Amino acid sequence: MIPVRCFSCGKVISSVWEEYRERIKSEPPGKVMDDLGIERYCCRRMLLSHVEVVEMLRRYQ
């Protein structure tokens, strides 16, 4: 689950998550974030460091 907003500045980042996730498979993450308009380093951090915890927790159900 991606957070809806950046923890630091409050900008909505969930709207770009799906496109970001698909595009980083074939393009550098920095270029993708530039194209999507994610310029603040705090918002970039949110996308770069996100770990899909739900997938890891499913193993333990």
Curated annotation (Swiss-Prot):
Substrates-to-products reaction catalysed: RNA(n) + a ribonucleoside 5'-triphosphate = RNA(n+1) + diphosphate
Pfam families linked to this entry: RNA_pol_N
Broad enzyme group: transferase
GO molecular function, a single term: DNA binding
GO biological process annotation, one example: DNA-templated transcription
Main location: cytoplasm
InterPro entries in UniProt: RNA_pol_su_RPB10, RNA_pol_suN_Zn-BS, RPABC5/Rpb10
Entry-linked PROSITE patterns: RNA_POL_N_8KD
Gene3D superfamilies: Homeodomain-like
Cofactor(s) needed: Zn(2+)
GO cellular component: cytoplasm; DNA-directed RNA polymerase complex
Protein location: Cytoplasm
Residues involved in Zn(2+) binding: C6, C9, C42, C43
EC numbers: 2.7.7.6
Record HAMAP family: RNApol_arch_Rpo10 (MF_00250)
Quaternary structure note: Part of the RNA polymerase complex.
Family membership noted in the UniProt record: Belongs to the archaeal Rpo10/eukaryotic RPB10 RNA polymerase subunit family.
Functional note: DNA-dependent RNA polymerase (RNAP) catalyzes the transcription of DNA into RNA using the four ribonucleoside triphosphates as substrates.
Name the record gives this protein: DNA-directed RNA polymerase subunit Rpo10
Species name: Methanothrix thermoacetophila (strain DSM 6194 / JCM 14653 / NBRC 101360 / PT) (Methanosaeta thermophila)
Recorded name of the encoding gene: rpo10
